[in-house]
Amino acid sequence: MEFDRMLIRYGELSTKGKNRKQFVTRLAQNVKRAMKDLPEVRIHGERDRMYIILNGADYQLAEERLKPIFGIQSFSPAVRVNLDLDEVKAAALSLVQDAHEENGTFKVAARRSHREFPLDSNEINQEIGAHVLQNIEDLTVNVKNPDVKLTIDVRKEGVFLSCRTILGAAGLPVGSSGRAMLMLSGGIDSPVAGYLAQKRGVEIEAVHFHSPPYTSEQAKQKAIDLAGKLAKYSGQVQMHIVPFTEIQEVIKQQIPESVIMTVTRRMMLRITDELRRKRNGLAIVNGESLGQVASQTLESMLAINAVTATPIIRPVVAMDKNEIIQIAQKIDTYNLSVQPFEDCCTIFTPPSPKTKPKLDKIEHYESFTDFDALILKALENVETIAVNVAENAEIKDEFADLF
């Protein structure tokens, strides 16, 4: 049977009370963007669900485009029929015939919110179940663990039937929680942090520090490609590429070796915070994981964070490396991240960096250099690009220009 719509269930959005409307509106905008090259599609949002009216569009194409959209708990290809029992029976039989396998099992799960329909939910289950059993010989009922679950939703505007539920990306719609700057290196952790921030509704803009000739064009391109992977979940990621060579060279010359990494991170954070201010961001996201490296001890974080009062979101802070790697593999950033190109966090790394730097000493070391002027110069030369979905993202080839 040909499906005429996709039924979208909100999940967590249902708990948002008075703010629900703005979350649903944002989700509808994100869905519309994902379907932008399907002009026949229409989106209809309601308080507890959303419909995508296909108007002849390929439902499988719509499925693929819904899968990475945060804010969707689950969705189902569905059909709508009139409030007529014979039409419901015909649609139910057609759906189960298409979905069942030989010697399979099924159940009917009906819900009636339109009280004028002549049968209640239990009666619908019995009537439709009996009709299906009479017409499909090798099918039996299993109410606990069926192979096919036929859902029937009787509403004032019609009866909606579906046989399959696909899990969505869950979370909150990207953009519903505001904007933040993601400190995107070429490593494993920061893309995962960006993904998790997006899942909580944050619109991210990536900030990447580029230090030629110490870092290569391949390292820069790797970061752009990683941003492309993250764009899969939002449609597009703005990326700010910061020239960082001069600052790193001055740090190497003027700052004691043991705290080079601490001062470097402080300068990165200052620049990121200024970009956040210019771009009306509300927070900074990074991939710090507690205790993983010298700059990620609590003492180091305290010394680094002292340059800003802006909230720092660390989605992976309590994760083991293996947990982070699992997510990186899931979102298809791992193979990119392990490409052997140095980024600015790995150059000039001292053999024995301090794990417990003292803030007063750090500030004393910095006081002999006019870092303000260097930061201003770097900001004046930032390159900003719009990054779309990565061409090699793990989605079907025909969907590569999805957003």
UniProtKB/Swiss-Prot annotation:
Keyword Cell membrane annotated: no
Its domain of life reads Bacteria
Give this protein's Gene Ontology molecular function annotations. ATP binding; CCA tRNA nucleotidyltransferase activity; tRNA binding; tRNA-uracil-4 sulfurtransferase activity
Using the record's annotation, list all stretches that form the THUMP domain.
60-165
Instruction: Name the top EC class.
Output: transferase
A matching Pfam family: THUMP
- Catalysed reaction(s)? [ThiI sulfur-carrier protein]-S-sulfanyl-L-cysteine + a uridine in tRNA + 2 reduced [2Fe-2S]-[ferredoxin] + ATP + H(+) = [ThiI sulfur-carrier protein]-L-cysteine + a 4-thiouridine in tRNA + 2 oxidized [2Fe-2S]-[ferredoxin] + AMP + diphosphate; [ThiS sulfur-carrier protein]-C-terminal Gly-Gly-AMP + S-sulfanyl-L-cysteinyl-[cysteine desulfurase] + AH2 = [ThiS sulfur-carrier protein]-C-terminal-Gly-aminoethanethioate + L-cysteinyl-[cysteine desulfurase] + A + AMP + 2 H(+)
- Gene Ontology cellular component annotations, sorted alphabetically: cytosol
Keywords, alphabetical: ATP-binding, Cytoplasm, Nucleotide-binding, RNA-binding, Thiamine biosynthesis, Transferase, tRNA-binding
The record's subcellular locations are:
Cytoplasm
Q: This chain belongs to which protein, by name?
A: Probable tRNA sulfurtransferase
